[in-house]
Design a protein with these regions (language model features):
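Boundary/junction segments of secreted and surface-exposed precursor proteins
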Residues: 21-50
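PGST-rich, cysteine-poor low-complexity/disordered linker and tail segments that act as flexible spacers
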Residues: 169-179
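Aromatic- and Gly/Pro-enriched, solvent-exposed loop/edge beta-strand patches characteristic
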Residues: 77, 83-168
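A short beta-strand element within beta-rich, extracytoplasmic domains
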Residues: 66-78, 144
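Extracellular/lumenal carbohydrate-interaction signature centered on repeated Trp-anchored short motifs
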Residues: 62-67, 134-137
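Short beta-strands within extracellular/lumenal beta-sheet-rich domains
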Residues: 48-63, 125-127
Length: 179
């Protein structure tokens, strides 16, 4: 009887460790590394009341199939501000935006976060933990859409993120609009 209890306990511990280790490994936070890129207004431009920002990351930048449970962006701001945002992630075969109106519909993406984000004064990494993890397939490119619904401007035109250069070049992987 004692041997059976110990055996059952051992099986329970082994199954629990397999479950929890699989769960931990499958949930990743993707760091959006713009260290070699310009200081720009995306993914949020605190100088405006509303905004929509989309960027495409290639499969080679994102890597193999996994669950993505959050994002981090490098921020450089002159003061602390809070924004009301939504974040969508999606798969796409697009490699860039061919025109300034070539947005990928958020209806074809997964809403992963809806809430507020606080951006602290100074240079720092700003993390967002998703409400729902996104299952990245490891094959397609990844599109990230960030919508700012704050409704008032808070900030300075000098507040910036490290991100892909926003330009009109043929390989432009970032698209945005602010009002």
């Amino acid at each position: 009887n004692s041997i059976m209890k110990n055996l059952n306990l051992l099986i329970l511990v082994l199954l629990s460790s397999v479950f929890f280790s699989t769960n931990c490994i499958s949930q990743l936070t993707t760091i959006i590394d713009g260290a070699n890129e310009s200081n720009k207004a995306g993914p949020l431009y605190t100088w405006y009341e509303y905004g929509l920002y989309q960027t495409i990351y290639s499969q080679s930048e994102v890597g193999s199939a996994s669950g993505i449970s959050g994002l981090e962006w490098e921020w450089d701001g002159s003061h602390t501000t809070t924004k009301t945002i939504k974040i969508w992630l999606g798969h796409t075969t697009q490699t860039d935006f061919s025109s300034t109106s070539n947005y990928i519909p958020t209806t074809s993406m997964t809403l992963v976060y809806s809430g507020t984000i606080t951006l602290s004064s100074g240079v720092s990494w700003t993390a967002v933990t998703f409400d729902n993890a996104f299952s990245y397939n490891g094959t397609d490119n990844l599109v990230i859409a960030v919508e700012d619904n704050t409704g008032s401007f808070t900030g300075s035109s000098t507040n910036r993120f490290k991100c892909f250069t926003l330009s009109s070049s043929a390989d432009d992987r970032t698209l945005y609009q602010y009002s």
